[in-house]
Amino acid sequence: MLYDVISKRALSVLEVKNETIERYRQEVAALQERGVVIQSIICDGKSGLLGSFLDIPVQMCQFHQIKIIVRHLTRKPKSPATQALRALSLTLTETTQAAFEAALKRWYEQYAAFLNERSVNEKTGHSHYTHKRLRAAYNSLKRHLPWLFTCERFPELCIPNTTNLLEGKFSGMKQLLRCHRGLKKGSKLRFIKDYFAKNSS
């Protein structure tokens, strides 16, 4: 699904077996060939997608980044380090890039020793990082930082910092689909395309 936040209409609705980076590239290229001017892209941070459009500003949805952190650290983390990183991630939608990067740097300086703790497997003698989920959360933030505040660097484009507009459309569609559980696959796809055609406003 490719959706225009300015006109609030679906530009492309496709059924695909696998969501691939190449498919996204093809769809964006097809839109450009039709004369559609793509000022920016807001996406959920699918691996490999963020760096795929070098000539188009790409914003990663900040709410999706928060979800990634919560998935790694859970909603009720126990250690001070995980609690602090989760709390920091929750500020993403209301902070600036400079403030967030400074806070993340302070977090690392405070908890680097904990983050880098290693444990030894008594059977094999091999060591591994003790706090793997915390490292995954921290590395996710570091890896995605170049795209989390694109909206701030291009104020003239008024880029949304989340995909909430599209998520809201999906939510309404799913509610209607639940009322039509008996639809066959082909009918369901037509229903989805028709839904976005009628709800493009």
Put a short name on every predicted segment.
Residues 40-86:
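Conserved beta-strand -> loop -> alpha-helix junction used to position metal-binding or nucleic-acid-contacting
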Residues 1-40, 47, 51, 55, ...:
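RNase H-like nuclease fold core
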Residues 9, 49, 69, 172-173:
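Hydrophobic positions within alpha-helical membrane elements
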Residues 19, 79, 180-182:
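A short hydrophobic/aromatic micro-motif that marks alpha-helical segments and, especially, helix-coil
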Residues 33-47, 53, 86-201:
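Acidic/histidine-rich catalytic cores and adjacent linkers
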